[in-house]
Amino acid sequence: MAKNTAIGIDLGTTYSCVGVFQHGKVEIIANDQGNRTTPSYVAFTDTERLIGDAAKNQVALNPQNTVFDAKRLIGRKFGDPVVQSDMKHWPFRVINDGDKPKVQVSYKGETKAFYPEEISSMVLTKMKEIAEAYLGHPVTNAVITVPAYFNDSQRQATKDAGVIAGLNVLRIINEPTAAAIAYGLDRTGKGERNVLIFDLGGGTFDVSILTIDDGIFEVKATAGDTHLGGEDFDNRLVNHFVEEFKRKHKKDISQNKRAVRRLRTACERAKRTLSSSTQASLEIDSLFEGIDFYTSITRARFEELCSDLFRSTLEPVEKALRDAKLDKAQIHDLVLVGGSTRIPKVQKLLQDFFNGRDLNKSINPDEAVAYGAAVQAAILMGDKSENVQDLLLLDVAPLSLGLETAGGVMTALIKRNSTIPTKQTQIFTTYSDNQPGVLIQVYEGERAMTRDNNLLGRFELSGIPPAPRGVPQIEVTFDIDANGILNVTATDKSTGKANKITITNDKGRLSKEEIERMVQEAEKYKAEDEVQRERVSAKNALESYAFNMKSAVEDEGLKGKISEADKKKVLDKCQEVISWLDANTLAEKDEFEHKRKELEQVCNPIISRLYQGAGGPGAGGFGAQGPKGGSGSGPTIEEVD
């Protein structure tokens, strides 16, 4: 088996990802930089060829010879309108060779031209090497994914790229199909299911509707926007900060490629941060002409900057539903794919569109496709492990799950590394005569005694008819579903009386007491946050007032309307305040307010004289928004009677 491992590769437009199925589960493999996704970039320099992170990191220094987006060229003719329109936006050169596009670069001092298949094969080679480094032996067999709308020539070209990379391509499968396999949606055994896959990646947006019946996948409809993705959101942030830099420093950095590239990298990082935090800060030293650029952005502002792009994702969803002749109520499963679906606003729009339906997002969205491809690869290699046989191969239970029996002994019902979903039932009985009820305490862990394991929850089954010890039969069932949500049910066989508990979120489980304690701490922190928020708000108000006053008196249109002395007075005071701000970023709220009053005393008389008492321009403080309330990251334990 070891030498015959097959891998699954998600060959993406902007990023690629590789996974392998072994030891009964899928491993998504990290590259040498520790990243689980690798940029689909290839760069050519005077001395070497770079692939992946190394290529993307030097793109600012070497844009003409850094190739990306090969997936937009593969299997297309040079005259294809898509190729013609994309060419306008690429920094590298695309040439025509017998109506086939080729990418022209300078490599080791010579001009070279490569077919898109060759560029893609370099990325595939990189993915193959990443897998080999992890597995410790050569790998040849692979399943590679393509968008559902790829035509035959694009599929064949992708397969050729695999062959060039030295891979035996077992199969080319559709990305949405791979994502559905990752979530085990083909194994629910519930008859025909309609699945909508919402795939918002780095460069493209695809909506697919699949019908799955008895393991057979049928693509019913595809829609989307081949030029909408994470990079567009980055661009909005870049433009926003270019404008901010103009406002603050009166300089336009948009023509300086290196500055824009550094800004873009910081924006991409900030965007990722905003999926989990409500505010992100950017710190770029010496961005342009020696000026350091330190700033921040809130999630709300980011959502506003991209609101039209986010909303536009729903149109293809409607189109796909129309084409599939389905109503939104007829969709059984919604699956999120692509890193950009981590954005909370995108999730909310989709969820609201489907009237609050749950989204499948327990697998990392940028890894779901490679995950499914790895599963498919294992099946095609005839992997006989029981996990693949009834492959609801979602995951495994990381720790044994069981309950406490007499004397504090841990009795495991579900052993660690069992494939989930799974269901186990065992009969227990009472410990003493006429015992009226039993306390079911659910634990996870490998130790023999429950006191050394982790308590997940407990519930009581009462109303057991009086009987000698050992007579009552209490049936306990542990049932974990594909998302790792555990349901424990206890039933008294004689009366049919039952009680259950649901434990969700197997990561960092917390007991009720801990949650309670955290709620109280959060209240305390909230008060501290409030003080901090007001402080930042006062600082921002002062800063923007100072900059506004400065621009007001420097306005060309005011030449001659304001005396040089007055102008100097305002500018000096503004400069003094701005310098003070830079030196005292951590001052208290009242200090900022005091400075503001000082500045107003200087500026107001001059500005009001200037506008004949019409009042100066407002100060428009940008109040920084702090994090919103509880984030619901703890587990929820619901008791059901």
Curated annotation (Swiss-Prot):
In response to cellular stress, acetylated at Lys-77 by NA110 and then gradually deacetylated by HDAC4 at later stages. Acetylation enhances its chaperone activity and also determines whether it will function as a chaperone for protein refolding or degradation by controlling its binding to co-chaperones HOPX and STUB1. The acetylated form and the non-acetylated form bind to HOPX and STUB1 respectively. Acetylation also protects cells against various types of cellular stress. One of its GO terms (molecular function) is heat shock protein binding. The modification N-acetylalanine is found at A2. ATP binds at residues 12-15, 71, 202-204, 268-275, 339-342. Induction: By heat shock. CDD domains: ASKHA_NBD_HSP70_HSPA1. Residues 394-509 are annotated as: Substrate-binding domain (SBD). One of its GO terms (biological process) is regulation of mitotic spindle assembly. The modification N6-acetyllysine is found at K77, K108, K246, K348. Testis-specific. Residues 617-641 are annotated as: Disordered. GO terms for cellular component: centrosome; cytoplasm; cytosol; nucleus; plasma membrane. PANTHER family: HEAT SHOCK PROTEIN 70KDA. Molecular chaperone implicated in a wide variety of cellular processes, including protection of the proteome from stress, folding and transport of newly synthesized polypeptides, activation of proteolysis of misfolded proteins and the formation and dissociation of protein complexes. Plays a pivotal role in the protein quality control system, ensuring the correct folding of proteins, the re-folding of misfolded proteins and controlling the targeting of proteins for subsequent degradation. This is achieved through cycles of ATP binding, ATP hydrolysis and ADP release, mediated by co-chaperones. Belongs to the heat shock protein 70 family. The N-terminal nucleotide binding domain (NBD) (also known as the ATPase domain) is responsible for binding and hydrolyzing ATP. The C-terminal substrate-binding domain (SBD) (also known as peptide-binding domain) binds to the client/substrate proteins. The two domains are allosterically coupled so that, when ATP is bound to the NBD, the SBD binds relatively weakly to clients. When ADP is bound in the NBD, a conformational change enhances the affinity of the SBD for client proteins. This is Heat shock 70 kDa protein 1B.
